A protein has these predicted regions:
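Condensing-enzyme catalytic core mediating Claisen C-C bond formation in acyl metabolism
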Residues: 17-82, 86, 134-146
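Short glycine/threonine-rich loop-to-helix capping motif typified by GTGT followed
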Residues: 68-73, 105-128, 155-157
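Glycine-rich, mobile lid/loop segments that gate access to catalytic sites or pores
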Residues: 1-21
Length: 176
């Protein structure tokens, strides 16, 4: 969608090689965009008609090495695992409690790596989950039902809040 045209599997697979095995269409394009979230403490201000407020149970962050060559495992990101562990511990939830996931998929492989690192499936099983349709909207665990960055592009300043905004809207739809 962000490329402005429907693409066939052949067009995607035959597009320019960027970094083997990733082709042009395995990489999300930088785009323009914005996202905004208003955060308040409980009882402050008006809910502006929000009949189903959403509560943040946990927030965590971690940093890792920027150079992939410095990673001991190029199919895993320690920072993702660390932040996920902290957030799940703070929230009292486990990966099995989650029923929709929006994650950073700047490259086609990133969705699989991140989903595994977040604990949604065993290491090495993410590709199988995706090819079996288990991560589709109608699957066991919908991952990036918004289309992710490959569908909407990578609006750098809005990339972090975009999934938050999308999941907030989905939570309101479910509650209604």
């Amino acid at each position: 969608a962000s490329m402005g045209a429907d693409l066939t599997d052949a067009e995607i697979n035959q597009s320019a090689m960027i970094a083997d095995p990733l082709t042009l269409f395995d990489c999300c394009p930088i785009s323009d965009g914005a996202a905004a979230v208003v955060v308040t403490r409980k009882g402050s201000g008006s809910s502006n008609g929000a009949s189903h407020p959403v509560r943040v149970l946990a927030s965590a962050q971690a940093s890792g090495r920027a150079r992939l060559s410095a990673h001991s495992d190029r199919c895993s990101f320690k920072a993702t695992k660390t932040a996920a562990c902290q957030a799940f511990e703070m929230s009292g939830l486990n990966p099995s409690d989650i029923d929709l996931v929006e994650l950073h998929d700047c490259f086609s492989i990133a969705e699989i790596i991140d989903a595994e690192d977040l604990g949604f499936m065993q290491k090495g099983h993410g590709g199988g989950w995706a090819s079996e349709g288990r991560t589709k909207v109608s699957g066991d665990l919908p991952i990036n039902p918004s289309g992710g960055l490959e569908a909407k592009g990578h609006p750098v300043g809005a990339t972090g809040l975009g999934p938050v905004s999308y999941t907030h809207l989905r939570a309101h739809e479910t509650a209604s």
